[in-house]
C-alpha cells in the first residue's frame, strides 16, 4: 500500500513537472511567434524591445493567467455542482460581464477609458454572482442553483443581443466582435487586471481539501463536517471574480474550463491536490497555443481566440455529452 502511494505521488510530480516544462516552451513560442519571428537571441535588440517586451510579453502573461483562471473555474464548478459538463459560462457570469460592458458603452457613449470598461465588466459578473448567492441562501439544491445560473445566462444573452441589434453605435458592434474572445488589445495598461487574478488563483489552488469533499457529493461532504453553505458561497464568489476579470481582459472564451479538467481526470489526476495546479498549468498551455494559432492562421488579420477554442473544444464537448448519456 505504501509502495502504491509513493508511486502515485511520483507520478503526480512527474505530471506537474511535465506541464510546467510545457508552459515554459509554450511561453517561449508565444514570445517568438508573430508576423515577424523573433528568436530569443534578438530579444534585446531594438526590434525585440518593441515587439517582445512591449507587445507580446503582456499579451502572453494575460493569456497564461486567463487560461489558468478558466480551467480552475471549470474544475471548481464541476466539483461544486457535481456536474461533469459544468464550465465557467454555465452560471451566466460571463454573460453578466458582457452586460456590464454593454451598459458602460451605452451610458458612457463610448467615452469611457479601458480601465473603466474593465471595472464595469467585473461589476456585471459580481452582480450575477450576488444574485446566485441570494438563491444559495435559500438552501437550494446544487441542481437548482445550476438551473438558476443557466437561466441568468440566457437572460443576459438576450439583453446583449437586443442592445446590439438596435444600436447604431460602432463601439457596440466592435464589442460584439470582442465578446468572441481575443487578446489583441491587451498591453501593460491591463496589468492591474492580471494582478487582480493572481491572489485568487493561488487561493483556489490551495483549496484541495474542501473540493475533494464536495466532489464526493453534498451528503458525504456534510457528513464529513464541511460547512457546505459557507464553502459553496465562497467558491461561487471566487469563480465569479476569476471569470469576470477574464472576460474584462479578453472577452468570452469557451470550452477551456470544460475540456481541460476532463482531460486531466482521464489521465488519472483525480485528487484536487494535483488536479487544481494541473488545471492551471494545462489551461495556460491550451490557451497559449490557441492564441498562437489565432495570430498566425491569417496573414493580414487575427482570428478571435474564442472561435479557435470553440472549434477545437466543440468536438470534445459532444464526445463528453455522448459519454455522459451512456
From Swiss-Prot:
| Family to which the UniProt record says this protein belongs | Belongs to the binding-protein-dependent transport system permease family. FecCD subfamily.
User: According to its UniProt entry, what is the function of this protein?
Assistant: Part of the ABC transporter complex BtuCDF involved in vitamin B12 import. Involved in the translocation of the substrate across the membrane.
Matching CDD domains: TM_ABC_iron-siderophores_like
Where are its TM segments located?
15-35, 61-81, 88-108, 112-132, 146-166, 184-204, 240-260, 274-294, 302-322
What protein am I looking at? Vitamin B12 import system permease protein BtuC
Q: Which SUPFAM superfamilies match?
A: ABC transporter involved in vitamin B12 uptake, BtuC
- Origin organism is Salmonella paratyphi A (strain AKU_12601)
Tell me where it mainly resides: membrane
Query: Per the record, GO CC terms?
Result: plasma membrane
Q: Which GO terms describe its molecular function?
A: vitamin transmembrane transporter activity
Q: Which domain of life is it from?
A: Bacteria
Stated membrane topology is:
Multi-pass membrane protein
Subunit details for this protein?
The complex is composed of two ATP-binding proteins (BtuD), two transmembrane proteins (BtuC) and a solute-binding protein (BtuF).
HAMAP family from the UniProt entry: BtuC
The compartments listed are: Cell inner membrane
Q: Which UniProt keywords apply?
A: Cell inner membrane, Cell membrane, Membrane, Transmembrane, Transmembrane helix, Transport
Amino acid at each position: 500500500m505504501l509502495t502504491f502511494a509513493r508511486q502515485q505521488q511520483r507520478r503526480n510530480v512527474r505530471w506537474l513537472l511535465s506541464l510546467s516544462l510545457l508552459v515554459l516552451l509554450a511561453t517561449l513560442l508565444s514570445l517568438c511567434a508573430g508576423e515577424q519571428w523573433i528568436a530569443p537571441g534578438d530579444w534585446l535588440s531594438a526590434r525585440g524591445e518593441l515587439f517582445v517586451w512591449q507587445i507580446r510579453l503582456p499579451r502572453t502573461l494575460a493569456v497564461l493567467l486567463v487560461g489558468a483562471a478558466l480551467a480552475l473555474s471549470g474544475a471548481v464548478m464541476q466539483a461544486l455542482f457535481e456536474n461533469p459538463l459544468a464550465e465557467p459560462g454555465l452560471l451566466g457570469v460571463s454573460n453578466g460581464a458582457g452586460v456590464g460592458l454593454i451598459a458602460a458603452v451605452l451610458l458612457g457613449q463610448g467615452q469611457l477609458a479601458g480601465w473603466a470598461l474593465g471595472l464595469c465588466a467585473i461589476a456585471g459578473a459580481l452582480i450575477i454572482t450576488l444574485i446566485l448567492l441570494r438563491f444559495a441562501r435559500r438552501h437550494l439544491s446544487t441542481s437548482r442553483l445550476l438551473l438558476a445560473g443557466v437561466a441568468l445566462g440566457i437572460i443576459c444573452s438576450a439583453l446583449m443581443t437586443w442592445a446590439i441589434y438596435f444600436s447604431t453605435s460602432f463601439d457596440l458592434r466592435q464589442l460584439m466582435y470582442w465578446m468572441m474572445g481575443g487578446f489583441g488589445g491587451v498591453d501593460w495598461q491591463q496589468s492591474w487586471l492580471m494582478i487582480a487574478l493572481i491572489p485568487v488563483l493561488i487561493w483556489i489552488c490551495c483549496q484541495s481539501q474542501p473540493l475533494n469533499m464536495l466532489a464526493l457529493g453534498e451528503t458525504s461532504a456534510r457528513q464529513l463536517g464541511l460547512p457546505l453553505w459557507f464553502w459553496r458561497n465562497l467558491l461561487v464568489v471566487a469563480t465569479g471574480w476569476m471569470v469576470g476579470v477574464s472576460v474584462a481582459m479578453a472577452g468570452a472564451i469557451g470550452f477551456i474550463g470544460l475540456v481541460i479538467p476532463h482531460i486531466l481526470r482521464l489521465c488519472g489526476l483525480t485528487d484536487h491536490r494535483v488536479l487544481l495546479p494541473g488545471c492551471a498549468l494545462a489551461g495556460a498551455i491550451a490557451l497559449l497555443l490557441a492564441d498562437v494559432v489565432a495570430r498566425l492562421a491569417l496573414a493580414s488579420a487575427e482570428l478571435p481566440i474564442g472561435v479557435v477554442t470553440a472549434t477545437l473544444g466543440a468536438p470534445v464537448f459532444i464526445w463528453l455529452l455522448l459519454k455522459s448519456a451512456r
